[in-house]
Amino acid sequence: MSCYKVMPIAKNIDDELYELNKLLSEKEEFQLDREYQKEILEKERKFLEDLKTANEVFDKRTLMTLFSLLAGKHLTEYIGIVNSGKEAVVFKARKGKFYRAVKVYRVATCDFKTMSKYIQGDPRFHLRKSSRRQIIHAWVEKEFRNLRRASEIINAPKARLRRENVLVMDFVGYRGIPAPKLKDMQDLDWEKYFKIIKESMKKLYEEGELVHGDLSEYNILVKDDEPVFIDFSQSVITQHPLAHPLLIRDCINICNFFRRKRVDCNYKDLYKYITGKEIDPIDEAMIKQL
């Protein structure tokens, strides 16, 4: 099974920069003029220093992908880490005057078994082999497509580009400050928010033919007094064999949260509102296997 080799950042950052940029310069599309090359070099140096300070380690191929986004002028600079988890790191970046979120999947620690399960049931993808590289590229492509579809229908960040294990999307926040999660909000009109979220789930299902799959107060941000759905990596199309068990779980999570806010919510009623059908006991039993 193929796998990227994880290489810690060199103690001498100049050596690391030299090696990475030598590889980049071999690509014809990255023949940069001297001044721009100097500018990019300083941004790369700062990025590596920030990674070292945060004890973040990426394999060489991932670093090259991130640097190629600077060299190709897809991004202007990386600013800092927004969120760091077991399977992915989210950076804040800029593209001119616009902020971007850059999601980088950790090749060494991703749960490829779970990823494969969600991908293989999706008719949009056909994995002939189960190599780590192929799985993670398909996973990023899946999230990219899901975000593109969702952002046309509901309040969700628009995906801008994907490259290998890196996904670039719109940054949800205020002047570079990340928008708060729903779980951290106080004194909202909870009835109003439940209604908006309920309608968004229904629109996503009916118009987008998507189920979020990991929806909770942790994956909903609040911006301009509106909920914003994020993290569509586990989202599946409605034809997927796990779509309805995942939707039931989403309904349970949402109702559990809003009941704590004293909003009347029953997950079975929410599911029926979204799908127009009663819950199938077989689908509900499958939740334990997710």
Swiss-Prot record:
Gene3D superfamilies: Phosphorylase Kinase, domain 1, Transferase(Phosphotransferase) domain 1. Keywords: ATP-binding, Hydrolase, Kinase, Magnesium, Metal-binding, Nucleotide-binding, Serine/threonine-protein kinase, Transferase. CDD domains: RIO1_like. ATP binds at residues 82-90, 103. Despite the protein kinase domain is proposed to act predominantly as an ATPase. Its EC number is 2.7.11.1, 3.6.1.-. It comes from Methanocaldococcus jannaschii (strain ATCC 43067 / DSM 2661 / JAL-1 / JCM 10045 / NBRC 100440). This is RIO-type serine/threonine-protein kinase Rio1.
